[in-house]
């Protein structure tokens, strides 16, 4: 982040993590403090920022990379402070209700878009992007068409961010992240 600020380069964060360890050693090692510092740095960074939620985003480490000017998500990406399995285990004392818990948490990319956490969803599969197409590839995230759509989308978003006035962009970023979690 410091280098992006010093050189005036945009910063792209990519979130695809199962999350940090939820144990005593992680807490004693200062994980919570590092997450807090990262959140503060991301919100105040003068450089244009773009976050890509590429796969799973679980825990504070994923949330720490989220406060960007714009947030994009792959169609099948999700974000949660606690994985649905963990939340299900806490709420119901079983992980068998993880799907129901995920639905209630609103962790899917479409839910995140509806709540203003994600700005844009990039379709992963050709049939999702064009309304038709071949069967699901074995590794949809490695599909050339998806990568082309993703690259074009990232390029367009970064160009738009770089064209914005810095003070206006920073004010909008701060306002955006103050609203997250508020009703209406």
Place the predicted regions along the sequence by residue.
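A structural preference for short, pocket-lining loop segments at secondary-structure junctions
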Residues: 1-22
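Short polybasic/polar patches that bind polyanions
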Residues: 5, 113, 178
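Conserved catalytic cores of soluble enzyme domains
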Residues: 15-151, 155, 163
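Intrinsically disordered, low-complexity segments enriched in small/flexible residues
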Residues: 144, 148-184
């Amino acid at each position: 982040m410091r280098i992006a600020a010093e050189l005036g380069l945009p910063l792209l964060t990519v979130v695809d993590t199962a999350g940090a360890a939820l144990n005593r050693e992680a807490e004693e090692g200062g994980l919570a403090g590092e997450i807090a510092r990262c959140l503060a740095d991301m919100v105040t960074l003068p450089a244009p920022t773009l976050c890509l939620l590429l796969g799973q985003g679980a825990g504070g480490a994923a949330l720490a990379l989220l406060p960007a000017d714009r947030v994009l998500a792959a169609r099948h990406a999700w974000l949660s402070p606690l994985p649905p399995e963990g939340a299900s285990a806490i709420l119901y004392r079983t992980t068998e209700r993880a799907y129901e818990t995920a639905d209630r948490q609103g962790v899917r990319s479409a839910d995140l878009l509806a709540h203003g956490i994600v700005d844009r969803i990039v379709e992963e599969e050709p049939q999702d992007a064009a309304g038709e197409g071949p069967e699901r590839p074995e590794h949809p995230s490695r599909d050339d068409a998806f990568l082309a759509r993703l690259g074009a989308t990232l390029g367009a978003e970064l160009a738009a961010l770089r064209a914005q006035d810095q003070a206006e962009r920073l004010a909008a970023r701060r306002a955006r992240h103050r609203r997250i979690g508020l009703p209406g």
